[in-house]
Regions:
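Bacterial N-terminal signal peptides that target proteins for export
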Residues: 1-7
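In a subset of proteins, long, contiguous C-terminal domains/tails are tracked
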Residues: 6, 15, 294-296
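Hydrophobic residues within membrane-embedded alpha helices
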Residues: 8-10, 46
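Hydrophobic h-region of N-terminal signal peptides that target proteins for export
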Residues: 10-19
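Transmembrane beta-barrel domains of Gram-negative outer membranes and organellar outer membranes
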Residues: 22-308
């Protein structure tokens, strides 16, 4: 495997998790979505974002809603700077319990030491990630239920499939896919707990990675949201590409951030994070990485847009 292909391999698989398209982030707080009979106040917050964070929220866009979520992210692995430009998610509500999703992220890699044996000789290069198509399906919603029902988490199923956009990516990751169960407890009006668990596949791996996240979301005001989250991957059948030996690989990571609604249909966000432990690097042992990013969510269209 060439050095360039090795670097692409790291960017698109188990080296940092924030590159997985399906891991695009959960909102730090949930907003009410109006139905056709709901009286709408001018300043009511309608959007429900899946960013920032790496777990995904269980709330589904209602029928007729169209939402765009995009952002910028910068990360550092020893010897390599990574800039995600952009990370973009489109969400389309097709039913009150089903939304369709399309996502793309492109990564600009910049070498600290182009002459290093662990890096390509290029000072920088762009890696297009797979185009991801998916659906989120609401399985259970406790909204409006009794107190006992509210202790049952709102639950959704997220399904994704990724298709490579370039021949270089296709050689090492022809097709990827994921299936995640998304759970959320609304403990109080200002506090919720979300947790996800799922399996993520790629063509090159005989066994899927297991992904798990746990996040706590705070809403101190109607406009401001805060979150802290742990997200982790576990691979019981990883392979060292140099020795061809199998081993168990896992990443334990932490991120935190905030959101601010500047308009009922526009939300800004900022976040940062790092890995607490990486069991093994495919290059030369455990390596830490850190990242930060910011973005915007825009509810482009909803059924009442024309009436406002």
């Amino acid at each position: 495997m060439s050095i360039r292909r090795l670097t692409i391999f790291l960017l698109c698989t188990s080296a940092p998790l924030w590159l997985h398209a399906e891991l695009i982030p959960d909102s730090v707080w949930t907003f009410h979505q109006p139905d056709a009979h709901h009286h709408v106040e001018q300043n009511e917050i309608w959007l429900s974002a899946d960013r920032p964070g790496f777990g995904t929220g269980s709330e589904v866009l209602d029928r007729g809603f169209i939402q765009w979520e995009t952002g910028f992210e910068a990360a550092h692995i020893p010897g390599l700077h990574l800039v995600t430009l952009p990370t973009t998610l489109f969400r389309f509500g097709v039913h009150k319990r089903v939304e369709l999703r399309m996502e793309y992220s492109g990564v600009l890699a910049i070498n600290d030491h182009p002459d290093s044996i662990s890096m390509t000789t290029d000072e920088q290069f762009y890696v297009p990630s797979p185009l991801t198509i998916g659906a989120k399906i609401l399985l259970w919603d406790h909204y409006g239920g009794s107190l006992n029902q509210k202790w049952i988490p709102r639950t959704a199923l997220l399904l994704n499939i990724g298709a490579p956009l370039t021949p270089d990516i296709a050689k090492i990751m022809p097709v990827s896919g994921s299936a995640d169960l998304l759970f959320e407890h609304e403990v109080m009006d200002w506090l919720s707990i979300g947790y996800d668990i799922g399996a993520h596949w790629t063509e090159w791996a005989p066994m899927p990675d297991i992904f798990a996240s746990l996040g706590i979301n705070f809403e101190p005001t109607d406009h401001l949201g805060l979150f802290i989250e742990s997200y982790n991957t576990f691979d019981t059948d990883a392979m060292n590409i140099f020795t061809q030996k199998r081993y168990t690989h896992y990443d334990i990571c932490l991120d935190f951030g905030l959101t601010y609604a500047v308009h009922p249909r526009v939300q800004l966000d900022a976040y940062a994070g790092f890995n607490l432990y990486n069991s093994e690097s495919l290059l030369s042992g455990p390596k830490n990485y850190a990242f930060f990013g910011f973005g915007v969510t825009w509810l482009i269209w909803h059924p009442l847009t024309a009436k406002r």
